[in-house]
Amino acid sequence: MTARNRIRSLLCKACSTAVLVALVSGQASLVQAGPREQAKRIHDRVAGVPPSEVVLDDMASDIESGRAIDAAFTAMQDSAFYDVTLKNFAAPWTNEAMSKFVPLNDYIATVIGLVRDGEDFRKVLYDDVLYIGNASLNLPNYSTSNNNHYESLENSGASLKDNLEREIQRSL
């Protein structure tokens, strides 16, 4: 083995060790965190916003009782999960540039509605369903020729969690 190869091998081992240490120490901080810190981190990641004290206490209690999944479902009840997290999750699928910075549209609204209603996610591919804004919001009518309905819904600031209604797509 030449000197250059030995140096390269030692550098690779050193880099690998450094990456491993960084990963392990990052995980260790989560393990060392108490239930409230874990609950806050889960809520921040899932909903993208800090939880209220009541929600934080509820989630911490779930975590302390070994029910971290229940804590995550609690975080999913925050409107920001639907308005931001799910919108950004589905948005890249709706445009060629795969950008999450696009206006709300029928596909994104339908993904959000199906998740909110606990439906089989595969239905987004085959079911005759479409989610539109609640009629009480006085939005422009749904149209297949423009996106005015969904852009107005998003601009209204209305919660997507509370204001999407399931419709039969072929009836619109």
Where are these regions (language model features)?
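Bacterial N-terminal signal peptides that target proteins for export
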Residues: 2-18
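Extended surface/linker regions that mediate inter-domain or inter-protein docking
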Residues: 70-172
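Positively charged, low-complexity intrinsically disordered regions
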Residues: 5-9, 28, 171
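Surface-exposed polar/charged interaction patches
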Residues: 13, 17, 62, 66, ...
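C-terminal segment of classical bacterial N-terminal signal peptides
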Residues: 21-30
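Short, flexible coil/linker elements and helix-boundary hinge sites characteristic
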Residues: 12-16, 26, 66, 90-91, ...
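Aromatic- and Gly/Pro-enriched helix-to-coil junctions and flexible linker segments
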Residues: 2, 29-102, 107
